[in-house]
């Protein structure tokens, strides 16, 4: 076959690991000498880039032995003194022992909780918010009829404690007095102030809940609620007694 010569030249050249351009030039398959020179220079640049690539450097490093520096404090345990362990294996065991060390885990947990406490101190805590929510729900259930003596009791409660019990009958008498209208049609009297506020609670507004919940705070809170309920019962009894007296006087 007339084409057998070039094919045999191609196989021989390909087995000798030469570039295809050189094989074509030698086998008479076409192509100029300048093209073959350009191809050879391009392959040389590519080979030079491969030699200087990080992968080639990594392969060279794998062939060379590398030293691992292990601290002296980590070489004291008995399990690291086995004669068959290499330095790399000892370093690996040191890292595992550090992870499972109780002191190391305790340090990490302490750091985490300190970070959480620092973040929670910048804004109201969960317990504070929960306590405020409960107090608001309790105050909604403690609504009483809006009367004048209740507001007077709140004003007197802020003052000395002895004056609250002494001034209770006067406040009850004022509460029975009906407000009248003046010439301008505006209401006067004690009840005019109560019209401005809708269903004000008898309970004093609690202290701002910015501290953590404790046993002393809960006890003082319950004691204040009990005192206010007792005062309310006394006022209700005195009011009923005066109403009965006025009813007897009218009859």
Curated annotation (Swiss-Prot):
This is Protein FAM216A. Belongs to the FAM216 family. Residues 1-49 are annotated as: Disordered. The lineage of its organism: Eukaryota, Metazoa, Chordata, Craniata, Vertebrata. Residues 1-16 have a biased composition (Polar residues). InterPro entries: FAM216 (IPR029373). Disulfide bonds: none annotated. It comes from the Eukaryota.
């Amino acid at each position: 076959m007339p084409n057998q010569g070039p094919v045999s030249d191609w196989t021989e050249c390909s087995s000798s690991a030469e570039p295809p351009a050189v094989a074509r030039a030698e086998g008479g398959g076409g192509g100029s000498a300048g093209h073959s020179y350009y191809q050879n220079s391009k392959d040389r640049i590519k080979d030079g880039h491969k030699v200087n690539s990080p992968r080639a450097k990594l392969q060279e490093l794998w062939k060379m032995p590398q030293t691992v520096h292990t601290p002296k404090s980590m070489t004291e345990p008995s399990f690291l003194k086995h004669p068959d362990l290499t330095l790399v294996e000892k370093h690996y065991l040191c890292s595992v022992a550090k992870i499972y060390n109780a002191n190391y885990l305790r340090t990490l947990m302490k750091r985490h909780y300190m970070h959480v406490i620092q973040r929670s101190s910048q804004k109201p805590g969960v317990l504070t918010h929960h306590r405020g929510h409960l107090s608001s729900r309790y105050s909604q259930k403690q609504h009483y009829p809006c009367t004048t003596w209740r507001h007077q009791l709140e004003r007197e409660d802020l003052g000395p404690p002895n004056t609250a019990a002494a001034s209770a009958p006067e406040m009850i008498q004022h509460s029975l007095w009906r407000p009248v209208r003046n010439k301008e049609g505006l209401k006067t009297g004690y009840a005019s102030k109560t019209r401005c506020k809708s269903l004000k609670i008898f309970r004093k507004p609690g202290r701002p809940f910015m501290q953590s919940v404790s046993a002393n705070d809960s006890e003082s809170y319950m004691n204040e609620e009990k005192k206010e309920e007792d005062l309310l019962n006394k006022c209700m009894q005195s009011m009923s007694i005066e109403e009965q007296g006025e009813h007897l006087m009218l009859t």
